Amino acid sequence: MEERTPLTMKDIAAHFGISVATVSRALKDSPRISVERRAAIQQYAREHNFTPNMIAESLRHSRIQPMKVIGVIIPEFAHYYFSSILSGIEEEASAHGYRIMVAQSNEQYEREVKICKSFYENKVCGIIVSQAKDTHRYDHFQQLIDTGIPLVFYDRICTGVNASRVVVDDYMGAFNAVSHLIETGCNRIAYYGSAMTLEISKNRYNGYKDALLKHGIQPDPELVRLCDNRTDAESITPEMLNSSAPPNGFFAVNDDTAIGILYTAKCMGFRVPEDISICGFTNGQRAVACDPMLTTVEQRGTKIGEEAADILIGHVEGTIPPGKIERRIIRTRLIIRGTTR
């Protein structure tokens, strides 16, 4: 898709100064379009090697469905949260007679672009995707939409593309977690989060900040760190805890980061939760495998996957009207365990 951008019905429509619907009818030889206009559009399409997504078209307009394959892009296979989402997608897709084709972006923009191209060439009937951390341009997503392939974002949504999405309520999840830390005695709470280029990062940070302000605590920039994995957490936490005004609470953007904080604090001789409290965000399997078990925000990954697949299938089969953008928000739940008082 990078070397030669596929011609889309939108491009043809722009060339002739007509609507995409008119182009679609002309390519299907509809008598509603004049013979001359049909011939001109069809010739232009042939000359420019236009290839419509026939699988998506057949699914959208016919009960005969020869190939029902959904492309799924996940950032990391190893992450429990994304694995649970994938499980939800597969269950919902299978229940409707669809198979899934899965690829991992490994948090790399270039790899994500290649996957989109591969899915396009393999004629998937729709794509469910969570963008990579490294993604900084969105042309590859827009091109898919322009070629008529339904696209649904989950978790990490792309605000630069008008497409359906399923997200958790990151703001309230963070707000409730930080409020719990404050209400159980913490007044200096550190925030470990991802880059603010991601919408989920902005929402979680705003939830953290607003919880502090609601409880009369002024946010301290010195307590905010760009850190979203265990390795980095173990590296930067000693400096934080050895500072002249150390935090007595931590809110981390995911469980792995929170567990890195927990491990480091215990190695330094701090008692958890007596000396410091820690809260994560995911509620994966590792949250109950650490000592003490982790207080965390449950994201309900399986539910996210089910909803994303439900929307995608709705777009493909036409039960969701063409052009309608579905936005679904999944509520979080605070799971209180041993790392908070």
Q: What positions do the PLM features span?
A:
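N-terminal helix-turn-helix/winged-helix DNA-binding helices
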Residues: 2-8, 46-81, 85-87, 96, ...
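N-terminal helix-turn-helix DNA-binding module of bacterial transcription factors
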Residues: 1-64, 341
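An alpha-beta-alpha
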Residues: 175-217, 222, 322-339
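Flexible loop/turn connectors
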Residues: 236-341
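Short beta-strand elements in bilobed, periplasmic/extracellular small-molecule ligand-binding domains
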Residues: 93-104, 191, 209-231
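Hydrophobic alpha-helical segments within soluble ligand-binding/sensing domains
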Residues: 164-191, 203-210, 230-239, 258, ...
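Flexible loop/hinge segments that line or gate small-molecule binding clefts
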Residues: 107, 130-176, 197, 256, ...
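Short, solvent-exposed amphipathic alpha-helices that sit
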Residues: 80-95, 173-177, 199-218, 260, ...
